[in-house]
Amino acid sequence: MKGLILVGGYGTRLRPLTLSVPKPLVEFANKPMIVHQIEALVAAGVTDIVLAVNYRPEVMEKFLAEYEEKFGINIEFSVETEPLDTAGPLKLAERILAKDDSPFFVLNSDVICDFPFEDLLAFHKSHGNEGTIVVTKVEEPSKYGVVVHQPGHRSLIDRFVEKPVEFVGNRINAGLYIFNTSILDRIELRPTSIEKETFPAMVKDNQLHSFDLEGFWMDVGQPKDFLSGTCLYLSSLTKKGSKELTSPSEPFVHGGNVLIDPSAKIGKNCRIGPNVTIGPNVVIGDGVRLQRCVLLKGSKVKDHAWVKSTIVGWNSTIGRWARLENVTVLGDDVTVGDEIYVNGGSVLPHKSIKANVDIPAIIM
């Protein structure tokens, strides 16, 4: 089996984190985002994975070499000299994707969910047509492009309606697909949108089906969604009874859904949770309050600080009695002074915050 991950470019929506590392290598729940996807593909029997990239492929090649060996798979990089949108990368990787007649998976690198690849493969084979897209239900379909099925058919897609004014359905494209190799004949090697060009042509030929995703789903490509996706992921681990989570019986765990790397150090009288991930070598002082936040490797939170709805970048330090909230994102090696208040915004790498930030801003 084969799979292609649409990695894309600069990851601007997730800055300042992506100023330091490519977006797929940013840790989500203490594991690089792309590793979540690779593990799910491997579990479904995929042995050949293509990463479609146009930014810093050499960094990812070096990092992912160990996973090739660990999983016994082949990872190839398909490097775009110009951005090819969402369909062009499939054509660029045709040599690999069409090396045999088996279908192949495609997924967007920003998506985190309970990846259903094994069930998706079985469903795709059962209907025998060219493509299947995974769809997920949303509460406000008017914000999205909605999938509409043919009358009397539960999976065959009739059309897509972009941001419908009237209710026509509540299922949207989840950014996970499986295709037969024949789809490559529909795509030219140029910037091409799979959603706007390829899918409508497949629908016209009655060749595109949908598959309902069970469980959580989130595009975590920007900070507020990264935090929301973390909450959903941790809740999913709780429902599964995962041993990865820190035991709720620990005296510092408050509300559950807490994931702490074993190398992290936690001070006295802390209240951590719900929905917190703490990475390797993080140091938490005494009396610290953490809620709905992500602390990346090597960061430090000093005594009695309050951190909520915040992503703390690698090797950053939050001072004593500081308070951060309202979707604050600290880049790599940021220092927040003692007793400082930060009410949202982004702080670029290697900066020091010495005055309160009352209005969300970009600190350069």
Swiss-Prot record:
Keyword Nucleotide-binding appears in the UniProt entry: yes
Pathway, per record: Nucleotide-sugar biosynthesis; GDP-alpha-D-mannose biosynthesis; GDP-alpha-D-mannose from alpha-D-mannose 1-phosphate (GTP route): step 1/1
A GO cellular component annotation in the UniProt record: cytoplasm
Cell location: Cytoplasm
PROSITE patterns cross-referenced by the UniProt entry: HEXAPEP_TRANSFERASES
Leading EC class: transferase
Protein function: Involved in cell wall synthesis where it is required for glycosylation. Involved in cell cycle progression through cell-size checkpoint.
Catalytic activity, as annotated: alpha-D-mannose 1-phosphate + GTP + H(+) = GDP-alpha-D-mannose + diphosphate
EC number: 2.7.7.13
Protein's GO biological process: GDP-mannose biosynthetic process
Alphabetically ordered keywords of this record: Cell cycle, Cytoplasm, GTP-binding, Nucleotide-binding, Nucleotidyltransferase, Transferase
Gene label: MPG1
Keyword presence, Cell cycle: yes
Family affiliation: Belongs to the transferase hexapeptide repeat family.
Entries under Pfam families matching the protein: GMPPB_C, NTP_transferase
GO molecular function terms listed in the Swiss-Prot or TrEMBL record: GTP binding; mannose-1-phosphate guanylyltransferase (GTP) activity
Chief place where the protein resides: cytoplasm
Protein name per the record: Mannose-1-phosphate guanyltransferase
InterPro entries: GMPPB_C, GMPPB_N, Hexapep_transf_CS, Mannose-1P_guanyltransferase, NTP_transferase_dom, Nucleotide-diphossugar_trans
Organism for this UniProt entry: Gibberella zeae (strain ATCC MYA-4620 / CBS 123657 / FGSC 9075 / NRRL 31084 / PH-1) (Wheat head blight fungus)
